[in-house]
Curated annotation (Swiss-Prot):
Function, in words: A-kinase anchoring protein for GSK3B and PKA that regulates or facilitates their kinase activity towards their targets. The ternary complex enhances Wnt-induced signaling by facilitating the GSK3B- and PKA-induced phosphorylation of beta-catenin leading to beta-catenin degradation and stabilization respectively. Upon cAMP activation, the ternary complex contributes to neuroprotection against oxidative stress-induced apoptosis by facilitating the PKA-induced phosphorylation of DML1 and PKA-induced inactivation of GSK3B.
Localization per Swiss-Prot or TrEMBL: Cytoplasm; Nucleus
Principal location: cytoplasm
GO terms (BP aspect): intrinsic apoptotic signaling pathway in response to oxidative stress; negative regulation of protein kinase activity; positive regulation of canonical Wnt signaling pathway; regulation of Wnt signaling pathway
Name of the gene: GSKIP
Any GO CC annotation of this UniProt entry: cytoplasm
Record-level Gene Ontology MF annotations: kinase regulator activity; protein kinase A binding; protein kinase inhibitor activity
Post-translational modification: Phosphorylated by GSK3B.
Interaction with GSK3B and acts as a GSK3B inhibitor, as annotated region: 115-139
Entry's family note: Belongs to the GSKIP family.
The protein's name: GSK3B-interacting protein
Required for PRKAR2A interaction, as annotated region: 41-45
Keyword Nucleotide-binding on entry: no
Subunit structure: Forms a complex composed of PRKAR2A or PRKAR2B, GSK3B and GSKIP through GSKIP interaction; facilitates PKA-induced phosphorylation of GSK3B leading to GSK3B inactivation; recruits DNM1L through GSK3B for PKA-mediated phosphorylation of DNM1L; promotes beta-catenin degradation through GSK3B-induced phosphorylation of beta-catenin; stabilizes beta-catenin and enhances Wnt-induced signaling through PKA-induced phosphorylation of beta-catenin. Interacts with GSK3B; induces GSK3B-mediated phosphorylation of GSKIP and inhibits GSK3B kinase activity.
Length: 139
């Protein structure tokens, strides 16, 4: 089937530039929360039993979910948003909408409240790093 096409009619068909501006995507500063969540996991993986971004719960530009098992073998589902991190469930991939837990600005603060073993592992890692820097400075 052939159709006649007037090039003048196509000028506004795309509208991508205008649409992008209207949706706030021009020069986008939006964070991809999945990438943020991956960075969170990589930062503290050494101090927990297991930690990974949920593949079951849907991540979006404004929210991601992280599953973590502490060294005490307690499991949590964490929500990561612009507001911070908070516990939303006490099992992997579980979100309890009725759970009202505080937001933490950092994963360090959150894990510090949940896991004494995390606190110890983090402190030990920090001490080892400081000792290594001291040795490097003496060389």
């Amino acid at each position: 089937m052939e159709t006649d096409c007037n090039p003048m009619e196509l000028s506004g068909v795309s509208g991508f530039e205008e649409e992008a501006e209207l949706n706030g995507f021009e020069g986008t500063d939006m964070k991809d929360m999945r990438l943020e969540a991956e960075a969170v996991v990589n930062d503290v993986l050494f101090a927990v039993n297991t930690m990974f971004v949920s593949k079951t719960l849907r991540c979006a530009d404004d929210v991601a979910y992280i599953n973590v098992e502490t060294r005490e073998r307690n499991r949590y589902c964490l929500e990561l948003t612009e507001a911070g991190l908070r516990v939303v469930g006490y099992a992997f991939d579980q979100v309890d909408d009725h759970l009202q837990t505080p937001y933490h600005e950092t994963v360090y603060s959150l894990l510090d409240t949940l896991s004494p073993a995390y606190r110890e592992a983090f402190g030990n890692a920090l001490l080892q790093r400081l000792e290594a820097l001291k040795r490097e400075g003496q060389s």
